[in-house]
Amino acid sequence: MRVFLDTNVIVYAHDRAEIKRHPAAVRVIDALLTESDEVVISPQVAGEFVNTMKRKGTPPATLALQIRGLSVFELSSPTLSTISAAWALCTAHSIAWYDAILVQTAIDARCDKLYSEDMQHGRKFGGLEVVNPFVQR
């Protein structure tokens, strides 16, 4: 199984101040890295992670280590075809533009699941299912 991570899951895994979500995010990422064939992020996710952690006041040396830590994930970059298909998703499914880019990048990377709290848990886009790891099951 191939999975795609949205920024919020990675941020919560690094931000101990997120008392409710931090432990869950760490457990989810650890499990995915152990059990999945590949855990994928995009440059958009990496950039949003850096921006968010910088805004939260993470010291530069710590952030540099966190950035290097992202190398455990496969990086999948969107193409112009991805952007075109994302626009079609955005208009057909009424989802936010940047969410559509993430969804299409995950689809292009042949992922089965997209872990995010920003979209409806269980929603499907073709063979890709959105999983909110913070939903009580």
Specify the residue positions occupied by each region the protein language model found.
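Short, well-structured N-terminal submotif of metal-dependent ribonuclease cores
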Residues: M1-I41, R55-T62, R137
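Histidine- and aromatic-rich ligand-binding microenvironments
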Residues: D6, I41-S42, I95-A96, D118, ...
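Hydrophobic helix-cap positions at the C-terminus of alpha-helices
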Residues: A31-L32, L70, L89
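Structured helix-beta-strand junction loops
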Residues: E35-S36, V72-F73, H93
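Glycine/small-residue-rich phosphate/adenosyl-binding loop
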Residues: P43-F73
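Active-site neighborhoods of divalent-metal-dependent phosphate/nucleic-acid chemistry enzymes
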Residues: L75-E117
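Acidic, PIN/NYN-like endoribonuclease modules and their adjacent C-terminal/linker elements
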Residues: I107-R137
